[in-house]
From Swiss-Prot:
Belongs to the virB3 family. Keywords: Cell membrane, Membrane, Transmembrane, Transmembrane helix. This is Type IV secretion system protein PtlB homolog. Its main location: membrane. It is a single-pass membrane protein. It comes from Bordetella bronchiseptica (strain ATCC BAA-588 / NCTC 13252 / RB50) (Alcaligenes bronchisepticus).
Length: 104
């Protein structure tokens, strides 16, 4: 294997046992709900933190996989989805590929 991928290199940054990005999104949403409606919404933070810690107990990439699923199934509405009713993780345009193959 020429370029090995080490598991530690792909691990997300953790705060309180939860990846930093989902924690920031969740705590920001709860804080906004607490500001707009009632301070009682802030009591949801420990519950949300516990739920997120339970979710990533087996796999620390779980939130990345959930985001990828949502992006592929619900947010990606390209020509491939319109024609085949499917999604593509990394579509490759045929014209670009053909031009790259022609160049010496």
């Amino acid at each position: 294997m020429r370029d090995p991928l080490f598991k530690g290199c792909t691990r997300p940054a953790m705060l309180m046992g939860v990846p930093a990005t989902p924690l920031a999104v969740c705590s920001g949403t709860i804080a906004l709900l607490g500001i707009w409606f009632s301070i009682a919404f802030l009591a949801l933070f420990p519950v949300a933190l516990l739920a997120m810690r339970i979710m990533i107990r087996r796999d620390d990439q779980q939130f990345r996989l959930i985001w990828l699923y949502l992006r592929m199934r619900w947010l990606s509405r390209d020509r491939t989805h319109a024609f085949w009713q499917s999604t593509v993780y990394a579509p490759l345009r045929y014209a670009e590929r053909r031009q790259r193959l022609r160049k010496p």
